[in-house]
Structures are given as structure tokens and as C-alpha cells.
């Protein structure tokens, strides 16, 4: 009996979003369209920035990095989720689950760092424009992006290593559509208090630090914008920052709800809805938010279309 109680789990069953076959078919089509749009738009933005010399600036370099991360972190979840919507019993091996968690964690943490770097870029451009070329040189941009990736990797490795040290016994049904930490911790037969503390400490500190960086940057930007005499100048400054601030608010709002809360306040169904939004919704919305009112991007797209028609 004791041996049966402590059978080692080699795979997890992902319960997903629903058991209804008809709804699964509808969700498959909807999520496939969203994922395809996300990939095409983000990869298209990267290509557009590469081929348009006018967009070879720190701001658009960072935007291309953000687009790459968005494409990656949606790809860490969406393909497996789409496959699971087509099968009766969705399973994932323990090793694949850890890899999925690692990839998703790296990408989403890196995104948080990148958003704070983009806020710093806007801060320097508006508050100290004379120092902009020095503060945001090509080398500095590469260093900031590299640091963002390193931060994402280190943070996620800590959680993944601590997660692998846990024992998973008989229970292996994950009440989620991917290997999310809170859902996995609920299945462990080990003491998970240290994992919860690490999650709250590291992810919480990183989220708060990067979010405060954004907020402080925009406070200085707001004061600097008010000192701009021309109305058009103020409007341009606010317009440039509004899109990024919107993306930041959506991103951190969903993450704080999902991760920075005690397990006693963890509601599975609400978490699934929020997770669906930040795994598929945010990567698609980010690009729309950043490019919707961006004249440079619109002009670059128009020129690219005209060039295509000319070549044809």
C-alpha cells in the first residue's frame, strides 16, 4: 500500500480548458488563428525593422527584441495546447513539462525586463535627449537586452531546479492547459512552502523592481513633457509613451494576479482565463498597441507594400 501511495509520476495529464468536444473544436480554430496572427505579426515586425533603415534606432531595436520574445513565449505554450485540444486525453511527460515551464518562464521574465528597458529608453529620449546617443548606444542596447535574457534565465532556473527536487506521487492531473508552477505545486506530495517562498520572493521582487522602474521613468517623463512648450511636442511625447505604458499595465496586471498571491487565494478557473490572456492575448496585443499609432511603422509598412507591388 505504501509503495502504491508513492508511485513516481512520469507524466502529467493536462485537464485543459474544457471536456466538451464541440467547444474544443471551436477553441482550436480560435486559438490557431490568434497564434498564427501573433507569429506573423511579430516576425513581420522584426523583418520590417531590419529592412527599414529609418527604424534602425534603439527604440525599434528594443521593439524587435520584444516581438521576438512575444513570438517565443507564445510558442512555448500554444503548439502543445492546440494539439491537446484535438485529443481525448492530453498528456505530457515529466521532462517535457519541466522544459515547457523553463522555456515559458525564461521568455516571460525576459519580457518583463525588456519592458523596463524600453521605459528607460523613453526616459532618456525625453528627459535627457542630448545624452541619448551615449546612454543608448548600440553597445549599451545589446548589453541591456543581454542582461534581460540573463535575468530571465537565472530566475527561471531557480524555480525549475527547486521544482525538480519535489516529489510527485499518485496525483498527476494538472488542472491547467500547460505546466504552470501553481498548478504543479498543488500536486506535489512534498513540502512546497520553500517553492512558494521562492516564487513570491524572486518573481515578486523582479516584477516589482521592473514595474517600479517603469513607473519612476514615466513620472520623470510626465514632468519633462509638461515643460515642453509646444503642444505638438507634448502630444508626441505622450503618444510615444502611452502605447508602452498600456502594454506594461496589461502585462504586469495579469502576472500579479497569477503569481504574486498566496496559494490559499489561488482560484483555478480564474487562473486559466488569465493565463489564456497572457499566453496568447498579450503577445498579439503588444504589437498592435505599439504600432497602432506609430507613424514611422505605418510609413514603413506602406513603403514595404509599395515596394512589393513595384517588384511584382
Swiss-Prot record:
It holds the Pfam family 7tm_4. Disulfide bonds join 97-189. The gene is OR5J2. Belongs to the G-protein coupled receptor 1 family. InterPro entries: GPCR_Rhodpsn, GPCR_Rhodpsn_7TM, Olfact_rcpt. Keywords: Cell membrane, Disulfide bond, G-protein coupled receptor, Glycoprotein, Membrane, Olfaction, Receptor, Sensory transduction, Transducer, Transmembrane, Transmembrane helix. GO terms for molecular function: G protein-coupled receptor activity; odorant binding; olfactory receptor activity. This is Olfactory receptor 5J2. Glycans are attached at residue 5. It is found in: Cell membrane. It is a multi-pass membrane protein. Odorant receptor. Residues 1-25, 76-99, 161-196, 259-271 are extracellular. GO terms for cellular component: plasma membrane. Its main location: membrane. The keyword Transmembrane helix applies.
Amino acid at each position: 500500500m505504501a509503495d502504491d501511495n508513492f508511485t513516481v509520476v512520469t507524466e502529467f495529464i493536462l485537464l485543459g480548458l474544457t471536456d466538451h468536444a464541440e467547444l474544443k473544436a471551436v477553441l482550436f480554430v480560435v486559438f490557431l488563428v490568434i497564434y498564427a496572427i501573433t507569429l506573423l505579426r511579430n516576425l513581420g515586425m522584426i523583418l520590417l525593422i531590419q529592412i527599414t533603415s529609418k527604424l534602425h534606432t534603439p527604440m525599434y531595436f528594443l521593439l524587435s527584441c520584444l516581438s521576438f520574445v512575444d513570438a517565443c513565449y507564445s510558442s512555448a505554450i500554444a503548439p502543445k495546447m492546440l494539439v491537446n485540444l484535438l485529443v481525448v486525453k492530453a498528456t505530457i511527460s515529466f521532462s517535457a513539462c519541466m522544459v515547457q515551464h523553463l522555456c515559458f518562464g525564461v521568455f516571460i521574465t525576459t519580457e518583463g525586463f525588456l519592458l523596463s528597458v524600453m521605459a528607460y529608453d523613453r526616459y532618456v529620449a525625453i528627459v535627457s535627449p542630448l545624452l541619448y546617443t551615449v546612454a543608448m548606444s548600440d553597445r549599451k542596447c545589446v548589453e541591456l537586452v543581454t542582461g534581460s535574457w540573463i535575468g530571465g534565465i537565472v530566475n527561471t532556473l531557480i524555480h525549475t531546479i527547486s521544482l525538480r527536487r519535489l516529489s510527485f506521487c499518485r496525483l498527476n492531473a494538472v488542472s491547467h492547459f500547460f505546466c504552470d508552477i501553481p498548478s504543479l505545486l498543488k500536486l506535489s506530495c512534498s513540502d512546497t512552502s520553500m517553492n512558494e517562498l521562492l516564487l513570491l520572493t524572486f518573481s515578486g521582487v523582479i516584477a516589482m523592481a521592473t514595474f517600479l522602474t517603469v513607473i519612476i521613468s514615466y513620472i520623470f517623463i510626465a514632468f519633462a513633457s509638461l515643460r515642453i512648450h509646444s503642444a505638438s511636442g507634448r502630444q508626441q511625447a505622450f503618444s510615444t509613451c502611452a502605447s508602452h505604458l498600456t502594454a506594461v499595465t496589461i502585462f504586469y496586471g495579469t502576472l500579479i494576479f497569477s503569481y504574486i498571491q498566496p496559494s490559499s487565494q489561488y482560484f483555478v478557473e480564474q487562473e486559466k482565463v488569465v493565463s489564456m490572456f497572457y499566453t496568447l492575448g498579450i503577445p498579439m496585443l503588444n504589437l498592435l498597441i505599439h504600432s497602432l499609432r506609430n507613424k514611422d511603422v505605418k510609413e514603413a509598412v506602406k513603403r514595404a507594400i509599395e515596394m512589393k507591388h513595384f517588384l511584382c
